[in-house]
């Protein structure tokens, strides 16, 4: 299968080298030029996911890249999504739908089937768009993963596309990363690499130039540009929790998020991290929950196991103390399920079959079922009747008298979530609550912030995507990039 000139792939020398960011930047740059461009990631492993318009599930990075292309997210943009649910196993999602869970060894054998889904999705996108901008995963030089590879060079070879290799200079060793990666590739794979992008550079570019000259002479491949380090660029993290915060002055609301072993969709908290009046703290193992105005129990891929971890760390008692002193508590998705009285997993969907006691803070019980609920929704928060948009990704069905006091009333007539009688505890299945300006402001007032500054998170994300495209224009060889995309340089 040949699609050279219409498909361009970005691979990285390491995880977090800048692949997602570079693909986002290139997508918006091409879209601004009027090119019909679409993002694509063959295989993604992440617990941060988004719901598509066609009712499926893809990695959140591809949803952001879709926004960069000015497109609605679609399952073809990320045909294989792996969501880890144990240290050695993951739920396998094909074309937006969960098909099974398996351990790493079983998935290695399954990759041939997964590759069929990957190539089918790519074929549809390549037929519909002028440029398919592809993001690799991790590094193409992982020797133990080379067999049956579908995420990096295995895919590039299958569709016969050129590759850009990106490396992060800020972590050090950039020349070793680039040259070493090339050395570990096969001859045909090495030939496929058409140039390098160096990411996160700080300082005087003139001091770097001798190294760039050496790299080009050593490899025979061009450096397509050097992107600067941008400290205040805030796009949603693909997997690792982003703990950076915007500069803040004045009184702030203290919000604490316990980081559980299988935390999912922690991008829910990005709007709080960037809010000028919020001091957001992620608390990990071995740490006590600090005093706070609001504690938020996040989503979880393994709710019963994470509930056990919460108890082992003594956080359940800390949460009860927090409530006794007048603090507020919010549970999102799996966090909502933890707030109830019982959690049942009769099918063993998230581990061993069985039931667990919840925190008992809402009169609810949840039963996990095989069918996952995947919806983009609109509605109104019960607090202040604030309008909101969000999305559901969950396998649980929750019942109980607390549902008579819903947290959200959806436009489709359904009620979602619950509130406690005293109003101090609230839970909802909806992710993305804080991205809606009015709902975020209402929740912050509920948690104790009297005068709330309205922040348009969607506008902030759009601004940063535009900034990325500006960086492409200023710092990369756009002529060569257009040639790699099969586009005229005009």
From Swiss-Prot:
Keywords: Cobalamin biosynthesis, Glutamine amidotransferase. The lineage of its organism: Bacteria, Pseudomonadati, Pseudomonadota, Gammaproteobacteria, Pseudomonadales. Pathway: Cofactor biosynthesis; adenosylcobalamin biosynthesis. It holds the Pfam family GATase_3. Coiled coil: none annotated. One of its GO terms (biological process) is cobalamin biosynthetic process. Belongs to the CobB/CobQ family. CobQ subfamily. GO terms for molecular function: ABC-type vitamin B12 transporter activity; catalytic activity. Catalyzes amidations at positions B, D, E, and G on adenosylcobyrinic A,C-diamide. NH(2) groups are provided by glutamine, and one molecule of ATP is hydrogenolyzed for each amidation. SUPFAM superfamilies: Class I glutamine amidotransferase-like, P-loop containing nucleoside triphosphate hydrolases. InterPro entries: Class_I_gatase-like (IPR029062), CobQ/CobB/MinD/ParA_Nub-bd_dom (IPR002586), CobQ_GATase1 (IPR033949), CobQ_N (IPR047045), CobQ_synth (IPR004459), GATase_3 (IPR011698), P-loop_NTPase (IPR027417). It comes from Pseudomonas aeruginosa (strain LESB58). This is Cobyric acid synthase.
